[in-house]
Structure formats: structure tokens, C-alpha cells
Amino acid sequence: MIQVEIVSPQGMVYSGEVESVNVPTVEGEVGILENHMYLMTLLKPGLVYFNGDDKNGIAVTYGVLDVTPQKVLILAEEAYEVGKLPPASKLKEEFEEAVKKMATAQTMEELKEWEKEAEKARTLLELVEKYR
């Protein structure tokens, strides 16, 4: 068993021991078991799920994944239990707004910021549609 903690600025979202955890990262999905090698990488929006059950889990946005042989710590900008995701209408609105802002971005920095927002909203919307 490996200890998993998922924390957002609002506080602890999940804490428990699991056989395995799958985490979306910028390098792809990472599967983690007890005694995993040390790892630190960046999260990308997606679903963190436990024990191979990809029907339930915690939706995360951007952040950091820190793995030690006994513990997985996920520090996410936003994290939601699958049943508590924002409404689809709100996510669609956020996505459309980000796409509009991308079209009018004045700098590469602005463009990257709005691309990130669009990816986050699109991914959360896909999770809402899949799990509701």
C-alpha cells in the first residue's frame, strides 16, 4: 500500500492508502505502486484514479507530483471529486472565453496562458460529460 495525498489551495481533497494510483502528467499518465522510485514532475489536467478504477477518482488541473517509495503527494491548482465537478455550462463558457482570448493575445506569454486555460476547461468538460 502507498499513501496518497491530494492537496489544493482549498485544503486536503484526498488522503488514503491505495494499492496503485494513476496520475496525468506532462510526460503522460504515470502508474505508481508502493516502493516506486523518487519522482517529481508537473501535472496536466486529467483524472487521478486509484487501484485501476478509472470510473472514479479526483479531477486535477495543473500542479506538481512528488513521489517517494512510501508516499504520493499531489499539489494541484484545482482538484475536484468526480461528482463535484463544476457544471458543464460553466466549463463551456470558460473554454469559449479562453479560445476568444487566444485569438486576441498580444504576446506569446498571453497566448500560452489562454491555451493553458482552454486545455483545463476542455479536460474538465470531458470528465463532466464522461462521469455524469
From Swiss-Prot:
Gene Ontology MF annotations: ATP binding; proton-transporting ATP synthase activity, rotational mechanism
Main location (coarse class): membrane
UniProt keyword annotation of Ion transport present: yes
InterPro entries on file: ATP_synth_F1_dsu/esu, ATP_synth_F1_dsu/esu_N, ATPsynth_dsu/esu_N
Gene Ontology biological process: proton motive force-driven ATP synthesis
NCBIfam families: ATP_synt_epsi (TIGR01216)
Oligomer and partners: F-type ATPases have 2 components, CF(1) - the catalytic core - and CF(0) - the membrane proton channel. CF(1) has five subunits: alpha(3), beta(3), gamma(1), delta(1), epsilon(1). CF(0) has three main subunits: a, b and c.
Protein name, per record: ATP synthase epsilon chain
Organism: Aquifex aeolicus (strain VF5)
Lineage: Bacteria, Pseudomonadati, Aquificota, Aquificia, Aquificales
Gene this protein is translated from: atpC
